[in-house]
Regions:
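N-terminal subdomain of nucleotide-sugar transferases
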Residues: 1-3, 40-43, 67-68, 95, ...
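Nucleotide-sugar donor phosphate/pyrophosphate-binding loop at the beta->alpha transition
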Residues: 56, 68, 75-103
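N-terminal strand-loop element at the rim of the active site
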Residues: 1-30, 184
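Short N-terminal targeting/anchoring amphipathic segment
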Residues: 35-56, 70
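Conserved active-site histidine-acidic residue motif and adjacent donor-binding/catalytic loop
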Residues: 183-186, 192-208
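Carbohydrate-associated surface elements
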Residues: 106, 125
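Conserved donor-binding/catalytic core segment of Leloir-type glycosyltransferases
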Residues: 140-160, 166-171
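Acidic donor-binding loop of glycosyltransferase active sites
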Residues: 44, 208-214
Length: 214
């Protein structure tokens, strides 16, 4: 894949199951070396770190950076023994952060309860104009056309709820069309179209014609 000039490759990572998902982490001397080089060459006025609690590039950047820091928190969970044990080590570094952002109420509550701080709630931004334009371009539906339900997400993560959706569809007796977008294992389900990974343009086109987005 051709990457933009502003993207710096971090190197190999290994997967770790966490909170119903899979986190990919990089550890080792190369992480510290790359982070220091990135910060030095960038000469940033402000460094914005995502998930500073993650023991990889983010936490390393938090440890070595000297200038103003902003952090965005995405994760949430019910409990974490690892985070509890790491708290004495983490808190001094987290105190370097001048501005915190949480993308959801749960992420904010998790950060406040587990590690302190007072992040501002700012949900992830979505450029809706792309989808609004796709909606306008979508052909008008006739009164007898089936309702279209669209799912977008990773298929193999239980927390995304795909299997719950597929189970619920068995109880629907109306004429519907179901399109599933996302990477992972497709299921053999009658009346359900698994299209796999799609481009941004394809995603906008499919969402543009949807009646229900899950």
């Amino acid at each position: 894949t051709q990457l933009p000039d502003f993207v710096v490759k971090g190197g190999p990572a290994f997967p770790i199951a966490y909170n119903g998902s899979v986190a990919r982490l990089s550890v080792g001397p190369h992480v510290t070396r790359k982070v220091k080089q990135f910060i030095k060459e960038g000469d940033f006025d402000v460094l914005h770190i995502h998930e500073p609690n993650s023991p990889s590039f983010s936490m390393t950047a938090l440890a070595v950076a000297q200038g103003p820091l902003v952090a965005t928190y995405h994760a949430s969970a019910s409990s974490s023994l690892v985070l509890t044990l790491a708290k004495p080590f983490l808190v001094p570094f987290l105190e370097k952060i001048r501005g915190g952002i949480a993308v959801s109420d749960m992420a904010r509550r998790w950060q406040v309860e587990q590690l302190g701080g007072d992040p501002v709630l700012i949900p992830n931004g979505v450029d809706t104009s792309v989808y609004a334009q796709a909606r306008r371009r979508s052909p008008a539906k006739a009164s007898g056309d089936p309702l279209e339900v669209v799912f977008l997400g990773r298929l193999d993560e239980p927390r995304k709820g795909l299997d719950i959706l597929l189970s619920a569809l068995r109880q629907v007796h109306h004429d519907i069309r179901v399109t599933i977008m996302g990477g992972g294992r497709a299921r053999e389900v009658e009346g359900v179209d698994f299209v796999g990974r799609v481009s941004d343009a394809e995603k906008a086109e499919i969402l543009g014609r949807a009646d229900v987005y899950v």
